[in-house]
Amino acid sequence: DFSDINVRDGAALIHQKGLDAIARFEKGDAFDQASVAAASPRPTVGIVSGLYELFPDNDMVRRSLAGMAQAVEPGGYLLYTGQPWHPQLELIARALTSHRGGQAWVMRRRSQSEMDQLVDAAGFEKLAQRIDEWGIFTVSLARRRNP
């Protein structure tokens, strides 16, 4: 996460749950390919949750996914989320202004197909998907192909 507050609270939660041996929460830039790729030790599972839909630029998403593909071992997994639509887009845009200098943060709703194509182009094969009963949120699982 890029927020010191989120890193502090996330690390505290990991410790509170007794997961220090298997998890950590670090500060970083999810859209900096080299930074993501440098994850050490190399993860067997990468998770991107509630992030890509907040940014309109597919080049940013491509860089992030390319870094994930470099970081995650072949045969490892990527869990990623999507929001193909949302009934409260205007409310969300007006509420999420902290990272945009007070400007509205308009959610980029990618179709599931578009998101899956970005994941595939990065070197992952989609295996499964779940969607909530309202069709708002998706969670997908993909496996890192051998380069």
What do the predicted segments below correspond to?
Residues D1-D32:
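Class I SAM-dependent methyltransferase SAM/SAH-binding core
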Residues D32-P41:
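Short conserved loop adjoining the S-adenosyl-L-methionine
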Residues G46-G50:
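A conserved beta-strand element that flanks and buttresses the S-adenosyl-L-methionine
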Residues V61-P74:
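A short glycine-rich, Lys/Arg-flanked "PGG" loop and its adjoining helix->strand segment in the class I
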Residues P74-Q83:
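Conserved beta-strand signature within the Rossmann-like core of class I S-adenosyl-L-methionine
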Residues P87-W105:
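Short, glycine-/aromatic-enriched active-site segment of Class I SAM-dependent methyltransferases
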Residues V106-G123:
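Short alpha-helix
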Residues A122-P147:
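Core SAM-dependent methyltransferase catalytic element
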